[in-house]
Structure formats: structure tokens, C-alpha cells
Amino acid sequence: MNEYIKGLPKAELHLHIEGTLEPEMMIDIGKRNGVPLPYPDAEAAREAYAFKDLQSFLDIYYQAASVLLCEQDFYDLTMAYLKKARSQNVRHAEIFFDPQTHTSRGIAFDTVITGINNALRDGEQNLGITSKLIMCILRHLSQDEGLKTLEQALEYKGVIAGIGLDSSELGNPPDKFRSLYERAHKEGFLTVAHAGEEGHADYIWQALNTLHVARIDHGVHCMEDETLIHTLVERQIPLTVCPLSNVRLGVFSSMEEHNLKKMLDRELSVTVNSDDPAYFGGYVNENYLAVQQALTLERKDLVRLAVNSFTASFLTQEKKQQHIAAIHTFDKNIT
């Protein structure tokens, strides 16, 4: 199945660009920028990429991001991801970035977004991978701070397609950001939110009913609530699931325990994504392979996941259908 997964056309919809910072790149950029790091080399840094839950992961994640200072850094980070994604036959990526992680360190908003966007444009031109950029608000910070960041984003409406919500979930429910999302909708942004990773089904309800999001990031705890399952299916709300991340952060004790297959069986619009691949041990194809092996997924399941990835995207209907046709052509030509 490895070669089949590698060749399968797919989209990635849950990817934090800061989470693609491989130890080697972190060390290189740190040296380039004169940022002292507590690791003598990439191998030591990789060993330090150890954590037991979401919060301990975030602590390491924010420390690593401290090397990102210049437009070139954000360009290099983004281009490295796009090249990796293209090698795994990702045709379209909807990428999260966390400006508050950088502006809180004195990095200009424009520096962050210009570096990322230049790479996205070059990626489309040179690699043929299309993309959309989603700005995430850090939920452990206040709504007022998030609103200030949203104000900064208004100047870049042509670049930023959507608004999301990430970081520490427990104790920071979606309801906390009601006003921010009202403003985002008013300004014409697409909206998504992380919900139901650490938080339970109620957080998903809040994201749907208070924030009125078009897509739920993670959402695995939806299976606790029958009414919620029916609502998600009826309203065709996609769920961007990240299997390796879920196991690494202890949401599930093992991949065999993951509920992805059960979600598929309930006709939920589930997609497979890598989240923060530099930290969780794999990019999108490794996630596909992990669930395929652990949950004994068949080819028809993999096709469904790939089709879902485009159906759940923010591409036009015409573009979605073109990609879905390519999936079926690929599948038909594989014996």
C-alpha cells in the first residue's frame, strides 16, 4: 500500500507551518541568525523533540520557533514543506500560521506573512501545488489580543483566506472567541477552529453554534455524542484528523485505538493530515500509511479519504472535481 498511498493525489488541510521546522533547519537558521539554542546539533535537538501531551509539545514548539526572525526564514520554512508535500503528491495545501507566536517576539506581521506568501506563490509556479493561508489565533491568549491580530490581518485579505483557532484547548473553549469570529465573518474570512482534540464534544458544538465554522480541526471527540455525529453528517462539516499527532499527544493510546475507521463508517467527512510533522514523526503519507496498517483500511477507504480532502477544501467546485477525477483515474489505473 505504500506505493499506492505515495501516488494517490491528495490535499492537506491541517498543517501548521511552524510545525514543519525540522531540527536540521532549526539549527541552520539559528546559526544564520545568531540565535543560541540549547542543542549542540540536530540529533540532540531531535531527541529534545520529546513530549507527553499537548502542553509539553507546545512548550518545545514555541522555543523552536524563536529562530525564525527574517522574511527569508519564513520563506525557507514554507518552501521546504511545499517540496516535501509535492514529493508525497499533495496537490493542494491549506496552511496554518501563528502570527502571535512571532509578533510577541518583536517580529513584524509583514515579515511573517511576506516570507510565507512568497514561498506559496513560488510553490504554485514551480511545483504546481496550490495553497490557501489560514491565520490561527492562539486560544491561550485573550480575545482582545486576538482581535488586535485580526486587525493586522485586514491589510492582507488578498493573502489570508481564513481564520482559525489553535494552541492549548482545555480551559480555552470556543465561546471565548465569539466576538472575534463575528468580526472575522463580517470581514469575509473563511473560518475553522481546533475543537475536540483535548476538549470534548461540547467544544465542537461551541465551534459550530457560536463560531459558525465551516470546518472542524481534529474533532475526534465527536464520537462521544450521537446527536453531534448526526449534525456533522447532515451539515457535511468536515473534520481534519491528524492520526500520528493524536497518538503522540496521548489522545489515543495507540494507532490501533484510533477512531478514524469508526468515523468513516458513520459517514463523517474525515480527512487525514500531518498537523506538525517535524514533531510527530511523519508527513501526510506517513499518516495515511499508519492508519491503513493499524486499522486495516482498504483501497476504497483511502480513496474516500483522498476525495474527502478535496471536498473539504476551500477550492472552487470546479477545481475540486478536477482533483477528484484525478483520484479516480489514478485508482483505476492501479492493478
Curated annotation (Swiss-Prot):
It comes from Chlorobium phaeobacteroides (strain BS1). One of its GO terms (molecular function) is zinc ion binding. GO terms for cellular component: cytosol. The record marks H218 as: Important for catalytic activity. Keywords: Hydrolase, Metal-binding, Nucleotide metabolism, Zinc. CDD domains: ADA. The active site is at E197. This is Adenine deaminase. Substrate binds at D276. Zn(2+) binds at H14, H16, H194, D275. Its EC number is 3.5.4.2. Its cofactor is Zn(2+). HAMAP family: Adenine_deaminase. It catalyses: adenine + H2O + H(+) = hypoxanthine + NH4(+). Belongs to the metallo-dependent hydrolases superfamily. Adenosine and AMP deaminases family. Adenine deaminase type 2 subfamily. Binds 1 zinc ion per subunit. GO terms for biological process: adenine catabolic process; hypoxanthine salvage; nucleotide metabolic process. It is an enzyme of class 3 (hydrolase). Signal peptide: none annotated. The keyword Secreted does not apply. Gene3D superfamilies: Metal-dependent hydrolases.
